[in-house]
Amino acid sequence: MTPEELLAARDRVVPDVVAGGLRVLFCGINPSLMTAATGHHFAHPGNRFWPVLHRSGFTPRQLKPSEQDQLPGYGLGITNVVARATARADELEAEEFRAGGRVLSAKVEELGPLWLAVVGVTAYRTAFGERRARIGPQERTIGGARVWALPNPSGLNAHWTVATMADEYARLLAAVGPAGTPEPRPTRSPQGGSTTVTSTPNSQPGPSSSR
């Protein structure tokens, strides 16, 4: 990937990886330039989301970013607080986070996941106006979904290692419970992404709809 290709990806929107009735909808801050250029969520080599997802027990093996469409088969999905891609999250304005929180709330109500997991407590605080929020389960619910704030897997977040992040993600997994047996079905991203085959992994009703 050349620097020119990365720069050309600025402000690009990456479709969500979602389905109705997910066990957990993971929500990143916003797409990186690498994610926007490749179309694969958490694609930057320094991002630890995929290793942490595996080590915590959410996936039986470490998926590659290019395998993101397998996530709904495990009852998992990915979206973002802010849809547009930037080189760094600190390029975003506070109002973008607040607007993103409103869009995210509507998306969660539409899709009906059991849990919304925001991977970045600072982003969660800004998006939802909860300045005292800490890592872990939150009192807020959105529709029928409970909310958990997770540490940001970015390599810039040096306070958390893969091991300590995996422990926190595993706490969420324990709260979520075991996966059911999914049934594949076609879905379309609410952001207008192309139709893909995903799944409904639990019995909760909800309409179907990548980072």
Model regions: which residues?
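Short hydrophobic segments within beta-strands
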Residues: 25-27, 119, 150
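Short, surface-exposed acidic-centric catalytic microdomains
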Residues: 35-95
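Short amphipathic alpha-helices and their capping/turn segments at secondary-structure boundaries
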Residues: 13-19, 62-71, 107
